Amino acid sequence: MREDKIGFGMRLQIVCRETEEEAWDFAHGLVAHASDAQKAFVKERFATSEANRRVRELAATGEVIEKNLFTGITKVRPGAGIAVVGTPEQCADTLQNFIDLGCHSFCLSGYLHDEEAERFGKWVMPILRERNRERMLAA
């Protein structure tokens, strides 16, 4: 019998900027110039993926499914199409909500990869470290 706890992880994009307006402008800019042909290709090519189908269902309700969760990227690429968008505090709040629900690992990326990783490491990680200090010590 398995004695470990089973947890779950999430794959998300991050768009973290100093202001919420900058973050949303960048997020919308990621998909603003996608052609109808590109959107149709992504939709058709990955139609058999259950995970992609479920994300597209969410995206059909609107590009913003929660205060800081953007589905627009699903229109132009498969997988990892949901982005956490906002200021460092807003990004940390959104990820903290998932942590509090039991998410124990994240696979995060962004555009441009190195720049977003640097912003995340400097701005968001310190907030999450502080908020989860006790959890990290107990692990």
Name the predicted role of every residue range.
Residues 113-134:
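C-terminal helical cap(s) of enzyme catalytic domains, especially alpha/beta-barrels
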Residues 110:
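Short secondary-structure boundary segments
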Residues 1-100, 129-139:
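An alpha-helical appendage that flanks or caps ligand/catalytic pockets
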